[in-house]
Amino acid sequence: MSKIYDWFEERLEIQSIADDISSKYVPPHVNIFYCFGGITFTCFLVQVATGFAMTFYYRPTVAEAFTSVQYLMTQVNFGWLIRSIHRWSASMMVLMMILHIFRVYLTGGFKKPRELTWVTGVLMAVCTVSFGVTGYSLPWDQIGYWAVKIVTGVPDAIPVIGQVLLELLRGGVAVGQSTLTRFYSLHTFVLPLFTAVFMLMHFLMIRKQGISGPL
């Protein structure tokens, strides 16, 4: 094992990276309320893992979506558990995100020089809400269908560009297969990609600037 470690150490300087991580200064005022961001990140990882597992069984078509979810819940070993964890972790992620935002705002963590950290956090909050909206529709049951119809119908009230936005979201005038395909793509590829990028930026800036001091 030592020879393998030495081989990697010679090329990647693993020890210096580990020393830098383990020796990072943590201010004495940091308490349990500073954990909300980390818990949100943990929930996101759970979402990725359980969501990936469900893609093996979910079929994003209006004819088979609901049936595939039923099959996952009733026939797949521990399928009900995986979907339940995904659902409850999603709720926990939203709750922890809200608490994290409140904590950062109340402790002044958005002030100079951490404005960009706040901006990336807000962008991740938008992604999180979008996850909820798009994921809610994927079972394609009555609740999901009408939720999509209402949400995608909101932009129609915008003057001039409203109809264009509506058709862009739905993939046409009416809610149908194109809408489900768009929401599935957003939920499983586009939003996770953007969220991962914003998270990386967020963490790098926190790493560079450190945790904000007390008020």
From Swiss-Prot:
Assigned GO CC terms: chloroplast thylakoid membrane
Tagged with keyword Iron: yes
Coiled-coil blocks: none
InterPro entries with a match to the protein in the record: Cyt_b/b6_N, Cyt_B6_PetB, Cytb/b6-like_sf, Cytochrome_b_N_euk/bac, Di-haem_cyt_TM
Residue ranges crossing the lipid bilayer per the database entry: 32-52, 90-110, 116-136, 186-206
Keyword tags: Chloroplast, Electron transport, Heme, Iron, Membrane, Metal-binding, Photosynthesis, Plastid, Thylakoid, Transmembrane, Transmembrane helix, Transport
Record: residues binding heme b 1: H100, H202
Top-level lineage group: Eukaryota
General remark: Heme 1 (or BH or b566) is high-potential and absorbs at about 566 nm, and heme 2 (or BL or b562) is low-potential and absorbs at about 562 nm.
Subunit: The 4 large subunits of the cytochrome b6-f complex are cytochrome b6, subunit IV (17 kDa polypeptide, PetD), cytochrome f and the Rieske protein, while the 4 small subunits are PetG, PetL, PetM and PetN. The complex functions as a dimer.
Protein name: Cytochrome b6
